Design a protein with these regions (language model features):
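Vicinal oxygen chelate
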Residues: 3, 7-17, 43-107
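A generic fold-level signal
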Residues: 31, 49-50, 83
């Protein structure tokens, strides 16, 4: 899939996809990013949603956020996982879409 996007749309990616950096229109000093990554059609990574995509949000204080989401009866799919580049957890929205919450390290 990545080869198709590179050949046809010029989108160069790594095994982790690619990142588009941008600036806030009302505060150009403030930056953000959007990540794009294609997964194989038979991936299990988006389970249990059954949808062919996943939304990922950067968050602060993931442990506190998960505690609040549990109080609101939000479906928490897994336990918080910690890696060199941050903490992650997955939740489901009311329509069953999987959402990855990411607290980057040192941000």
């Amino acid at each position: 899939m990545n080869e198709w996007y590179a050949k046809n749309l010029g989108l160069e990616t790594s095994e982790y996809g690619t990142t588009f950096e941008w600036r806030h229109a009302d505060d150009p000093a403030k930056t953000g990013s959007t990540s794009w990554c294609a997964f194989p059609q038979d991936t299990k990574y988006f389970n249990p949603s059954g949808k062919p995509f996943m939304i990922n949000y950067r968050v602060e204080n993931l442990v506190e956020l998960v505690a609040e989401l549990k109080k609101e009866n939000v479906t928490i799919v897994d336990e918080i996982a910690e890696y060199d580049y941050g903490k992650f957890v997955h939740i489901l929205d009311p329509e069953g879409n999987i959402i990855e919450l990411w607290e980057p390290k040192n941000e």
